[in-house]
Each structure stands twice: as structure tokens, then as C-alpha cells.
Amino acid sequence: MTETKNEIRVAKNHKDRLFRMIFREKKELLSLYNAVNGTSYTNAEDLEIVTLENAIYMNMKNDLAFIMDSYLNLYEHQSTYSPNMPLRDLFYIAKELQGQVNHRDLYRNTLIKIPTPRFLVFYNLSLIHI
């Protein structure tokens, strides 16, 4: 963190790490899910955490990814706006589904059911004026 006359700058990756740290436990993640979706689920074990951590392909990593109620939820925390977040989310979902689907099943005649993806980005300011 650096400080100037009237402002404090916080390292972007520190905020990102804090977001992941707070919601890495299923109980807290379920609470966030309920707040975002207006639901009242109580069993945190219904969550299946599937967050990508430094996947080999493109060195991708996302903040939070989990399956709940047949939805694949990808939650990202950003300190600045990025118009490329939808594309990044597409890459994340593709990489996650590659891991969940047996490659041989792609060539069979039966439909492979996948969870419906939901993307959510939490933004905050990168500069705090005091």
C-alpha cells in the first residue's frame, strides 16, 4: 500500500486475495450465493467448489467457481473495469467444462448435461480518497 497526500492506493492483488480468502469456505460462499440470488439455502455441503487454480492452459485462474442448484457460478472480483471480462469468463467456463466432461462422451449419441453458467463480477474502486 502506498500513500500520498490525500489518497491511499491498495495493491489490486491484495483485494483479490482478500475476496478469495473470505469466500473460500463453503459457509461464507453459500451466504454470498444466497445474498446475490435472493435464496435461503442452508446446507453448505450442497456447494461443489470448482475454482480454477493456475490451470496449465493459459495460466488461467479465477476467483470463485462453484456448482449450486445445477448452475455453474463464476464470481470474479475486480478493482477496475475490464471490457474483456465476458471473454475471460467464457475461457473459464470452457476450461472448467473440459475437466468435468469425459472427452470420449463428446462423440456419443447421448446429450451431455452441463450446469448452466452464471457470471458475476464484483467491482470496487482502485483509489480511495480521504
Can you name each region flagged by the protein language model?
Residues M1-I128:
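Accessory alpha/beta interaction modules
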